[in-house]
Amino acid sequence: HPMIKPHVNSAAMTYDLACDPMYENLMTATSHLTGKKVNRFTHIHQSIEDLVNKVKMMRMIAQKTGTCFQRCVGFDAMNATFITTYNMDKKYGTNYHERFKKWMTYVQENDLMIAGAMTDVKGNRSLKPSKQADPDLFTHVVEKREDGVVICGAKAHMTGMANSHEMLILPTTNLLDGDQDYAIACAVPVDAEGITHIFGRQTNDQRRLQGDLDTGNSEYAIVGGETLTVLDHVFVPWDRVFMCGETDFAQDYVARFAAYHRQNYGGCKVGNSDVLIGATSMIAKMNGTRKNSLIKDKLTEMIHLAETMYCCSLACSYEGVKEEAGSYYVNTLLANEVKLNCTRNMYEIS
């Protein structure tokens, strides 16, 4: 469909570039689970180099698409889950980590696109999940069976969900005693029974019905094809459940995901900035104003702001550490600096 096609094209680039020898070093990695070459978007970070290459990869893809390519949220959710399941098993003697590794092997073998499903619709922000007027405002377990669990709720602003094979559901906030039903992490196919996806409106989306003229980034669109995903009594077998009731790990889980995700911004946002800066320079050239001192100052400032964001992402990657689980985790403080600079600099650049 013309209103969805650009987002499909953008996600497809994460597959096409992985098959291009020119970009193989950034787009692929060696799985520590199987020893095979896998798409980096399905990889669990095994070194500082992996963390750095993630940022460089994202800048490169963004330079080619000028938009969101949608696999980053799932990528970060998988890496956060790898650490969290290990830590839960260590404390409680559960078997989440082995389950997760088995599922990760399946994801890698099939190069699946995973949507990270964290953000709930939330309702009254002053109340914890178990105190909401409507229990479905946060995703939660409504039934435990011998063969699995049944969940209800909704996940909002789901980047890339419409193009993904599966979603990795995780908590969205710190949880307290009484919130056990909301401490759920699991993997679910996007077309499982009981799931409805509501595709969000996009800027100038109806113009695409008339062709490519005046539609902005007509090939790849401008955002990530977000959905509101409703979960209406969705069954999840136990071998796809990676947290169930461990409220004391929810906050750390969310924090790890957030740090990994903030690391990205100095990659993808800077790649998008590269496109904008290049276009601005070209427009100035066509108008005969590129040598004007004011224009040169503005372009220089745009480059400075973009490279500052990139430096922050590289810094939090190079300062990463090896976790007891065996994977590598970014420096949280510096990852937060990425976020702070990006939320300011992107607006100044544009």
Where are these regions (language model features)?
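A short, Trp-centered hydrophobic/proline-enriched beta-strand micro-motif
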Residues: D111-N124
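Conserved short loop/turn motifs at secondary-structure junctions
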Residues: Y86-G93, D120-K122, D297-E301
